[in-house]
């Protein structure tokens, strides 16, 4: 019932918001003084953030309900990470943070949905940029690990928090829960909840490790027998 309510409310909010954005675009075509134009810029920016939040909420509710159709294809995790770097180049530069990357030289092919996997990786990096202490480094790492559940491909993002992390790791992935309880930065609290929900829906897992001021977020995806066979064939081992 709660998921249905969120889905319906999110959908109903889209129509008036779209109308508001349309009227703001019409206003831009008018002759406005600098003060009014500055106000319009602020309203437009806030409307864009509201639209992003509504779309995230709608997408999260849909994925939580299991009512989503994935378009599975073979993807390269390393290549996706590099693509996100390019797409977020301005945000990374504006953050003033140093991104330290360590991508495995092994094949990072996996069968997944490009849009959802992209959003997972993007949210992890955005979360690190948003909540890191100034002048610190963000570590992005891809690697393989083996265990009783078989081989897994992992993406790990580690940052130094710019605030006291006086919370339990279970709290951080709750919908609308935010690590920064003082609300000193912008955000709607959906970022890591989306990562957790999407990863689970794609057959993976999401975990967080907190050690003093170090915040480590990790997603893992199982490597299927088909993927392992394809990797062996590419390496000339079959």
List the model feature ranges, each with a label.
Residues 45-50:
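Short alpha-helical segment of the dimerization/phosphotransfer core of two-component systems
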Residues 65-70, 109-112:
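Conserved micro-motifs of the catalytic ATP-binding
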Residues 71-74, 93, 98-108:
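Conserved catalytic submotifs in the C-terminal HATPase_c
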Residues 71-85:
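A conserved beta-strand-to-alpha-helix junction within the catalytic ATP-binding
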Residues 128-129:
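Short helix-loop "hinge" at the ATP-lid/N-box region of the Bergerat-fold HATPase_c
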Residues 164-177:
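Short conserved segment of the HATPase_c
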Residues 203-212:
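Glycine-rich ATP-binding loops of the HATPase_c
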